[in-house]
Amino acid sequence: MRTYLDLLQHVLDHGVDRDDRTGTGTRSVFGYQMRFDLEEGFPVLTTKKLHLRSIIHELLWFLKGDTNIAYLKENGVTIWDEWADENGDLGPVYGYQWRSWPAPDGRHIDQIANLLKMLHTNPQSRRLIVSAWNPALVDEMALPPCHCLFQFYVANGRLSCQLYQRSADIFLGVPFNIASYALLTMMIAQVTGLKPGEFIHTLGDAHIYSNHFEQARLQLTRTPKKLPVMHINPDVKDLFAFRFEDFRLDGYEADPTIKAPIAV
């Protein structure tokens, strides 16, 4: 994925060095966009191996509306451990906002179910939007949503998705986000009778942590390989019925993992 390497290089060359919430320090740019045509392969990094199991289980966890890490722990996923409390709770994070956004009248809005309904009944709508950024509840979240709003677009039988990510940890987080939302787009396309189109990733504060510079430069020495193909069980027609076993990634050849510390 040359597109991702171009982002790394751009931020290293043109970013501004800034202090940040974690005290680590970053080099960042404000405003950057990447586009991935999902017909050209599944956009997962080949210049370092990603833990696909974590990506899939996290997405299924979001779609369940879950906000406790028990499901993730049961499936060997540790990416949320640093933020959970002693009971494994994270507060009203992504899954809660996606599936149970609290309305002023006491109702809870299932944004994902509403999205699916609109894709069936009014696919030309400009309101095919899901938001995880709820100002009334941000302070109750263990970590406010970094990937905070996404919109779908249907044209010529293809479903495209654009994600706005307010805060983008380029070395560790962004590769996960690309693969996760690409997969979500493919899943929703399948259950709505559409073909996958593009995934467009729009970044706000796009940053590389100062203790990731060496790792980023190592990754830039590597050559991207052909993208793998994601196969999804064609029998699944209900978005909320997908299981881990319904996904198979063929042809994934990647360079070794590059370890880097997480800024909490």
Swiss-Prot record:
The keyword Transferase applies. (6R)-5,10-methylene-5,6,7,8-tetrahydrofolate binds at residues 51, 169, 263. One of its GO terms (molecular function) is thymidylate synthase activity. Catalyzes the reductive methylation of 2'-deoxyuridine-5'-monophosphate (dUMP) to 2'-deoxythymidine-5'-monophosphate (dTMP) while utilizing 5,10-methylenetetrahydrofolate (mTHF) as the methyl donor and reductant in the reaction, yielding dihydrofolate (DHF) as a by-product. This enzymatic reaction provides an intracellular de novo source of dTMP, an essential precursor for DNA biosynthesis. Its EC number is 2.1.1.45. DUMP binds at residues 21, 126-127, 166-169, 177, 207-209. GO terms for biological process: dTMP biosynthetic process; dTTP biosynthetic process; methylation. Belongs to the thymidylate synthase family. Bacterial-type ThyA subfamily. Transmembrane segments: none annotated. It is found in: Cytoplasm. InterPro entries: Thymidate_synth/dCMP_Mease, Thymidate_synth/dCMP_Mease_dom, Thymidate_synth/dCMP_Mease_sf, Thymidylate_synthase, Thymidylate_synthase_AS. Keywords: Cytoplasm, Methyltransferase, Nucleotide biosynthesis, Transferase. It holds the Pfam family Thymidylat_synt. Its main location: cytoplasm. It comes from Brucella melitensis biotype 1 (strain ATCC 23456 / CCUG 17765 / NCTC 10094 / 16M). Homodimer. This is Thymidylate synthase.
